[in-house]
Amino acid sequence: PIDRKGTKCLKYDFAVERGMPADILPLWVADMDFQTSSYIQDAIVETASHGIFGYSESDDAYFEALQGWMRRRHQFEIEKKWVVKTPGIVLALAMAVKAYTKCGDGVLLQSPVYYPFSEVIRDNGRRVISNDLVLGEDNRYHIDFVDFEDKIVRENIKLFLLCNPHNPVGRVW
């Protein structure tokens, strides 16, 4: 890990003014405390060095990398036309909620979960239906599949939002 204090880092340098204790240990998911890979740093420098910052598009190499990863990791073939890029997870969640449900529909999630999941559902006029994760004797969270199936049938669920890896419980499903 690297010391991010004094780098205008939101989770450390602005904790007190956001009402947090000065000695808080922030355990954020998407704000890492380790240095970015040199390959990524080099690619950023190379891209920035031409000095033009207009809109860009992904080329075939981008899609081929995604396809290769899905093939190696999940033995699953994806098509380029299936890939929809978004600037962030919250917008992607909102797009899915709007595309696959109607106002008043129930959308299933698994609590506890990253709070924007439920906000996006409510903000779009849908109902939050929770299949609560269960903390087992092994001190790991598990899915209650009986409740999961019951909620899908009883609430006529049209969409299930899976958080994977799960935030905040840390499970990879």
Role assignments for model-derived ranges:
Residues 53-173:
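Conserved core of the PLP fold type I
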Residues 2-88, 95:
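N-terminal small-domain helix-loop-helix segment of the aminotransferase-like
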